[in-house]
Regions:
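GST-like domain detector, emphasizing the conserved glutathione-binding G-site
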Residues: 1-107
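Short alpha-helical hairpin
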Residues: 17, 121-122, 220
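Hydrophobic, Leu/Ile/Phe/Ala-enriched alpha-helical segments that form helix-helix packing faces
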Residues: 46, 147-150, 154, 199-203, ...
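Short secondary-structure transition/capping segments
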Residues: 50-64, 103-114, 131-133, 202-216
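Generic alpha-helical structural signal
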Residues: 68, 144-148, 197
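GST-like fold's C-terminal all-alpha helical module
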Residues: 79-189
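Extended hydrophobic/aromatic segments used for targeting, binding, or gating
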Residues: 167-223
Length: 223
């Protein structure tokens, strides 16, 4: 499917999102006069426009309801983990934010002009996400149990197939982002959940080791 990608700087979606695609969060999409917000809504619409290959099991397949529930969990719960951690990391090292901007991103201003705004942007992201050091640390502490659930779904054949389904894309994108945080990476590496990143291109940015306090750092994943 042909498309045009529009890159937005962090927080600017609050200003331009309503006019462009009808919301203040990302992702958003505009198809003609139709405006859609949110990954699940967008994937359902894309499935309607391009039915094959489908992102969901057939309607008569009992696995369909399970995949939809896993997708919901990934969107509403697992996705909150990087949302809690990344702003606190960026506050500590604002310059790290620039590493997540690939060479193919169309910025409205030269990078040198944007750099002075990075510390403020990081703090605004934390306010927007309602995250504190305590919530970030708690999110890391709860991640192993969440990864256990993902590993179990892979073992049951609901995730990790040869062709990704909607839940693979929802959860795999979050896993990929979490693995870009070097202090969190060891918690995921070696798990079946880590293999869900294969559906995506390599991550551009990285939060280097030592950005988060040492007492937050997770224990290595099980062998």
């Amino acid at each position: 499917m042909a498309f045009d990608r529009v890159d937005l700087l962090p927080m600017t979606q609050l200003l331009v999102g309503p006019a462009r695609y009808g919301g203040t969060t990302v992702p958003g999409i505009r198809i003609g006069g139709e405006r859609l917000v949110g990954s699940r809504t967008i994937m359902r619409r894309l499935d309607e426009l391009t039915p094959e290959p489908s992102l969901l099991p057939a309607p008569e397949d009992p696995a369909r309801a399970q995949v939809l529930e896993i997708e919901r969990w990934g969107d509403e719960e697992l996705q909150d983990v990087p949302r809690a951690i990344l702003p606190r990391a960026f506050i500590r090292k604002p310059a790290v934010m620039e590493s997540f901007v690939g060479d193919d991103v169309n910025l409205p201003l030269p990078r040198a002009m944007l750099r002075p705004s990075l510390p403020l942007t990081a703090r605004l992201m934390a306010i927007r996400s309602k995250t504190t050091d305590e919530t970030a640390r708690a999110s890391i502490a709860g991640l192993p149990e969440q990864l256990d659930r993902v590993d179990a779904w892979i073992a049951d054949g609901l995730l990790g197939g040869d062709r990704p389904n909607a839940a693979d894309l929802q959860i795999g994108s979050t896993i990929r982002l979490l693995m870009a945080i070097a202090d969190v990476h060891p918690l995921i590496a070696g798990r079946p959940a880590a293999k869900l990143t294969r559906y995506f291109p390599p991550m551009v940015g990285e939060v280097p080791a030592g950005t988060l306090p040492a007492e937050w750092q997770p224990a290595p994943a099980r062998g």
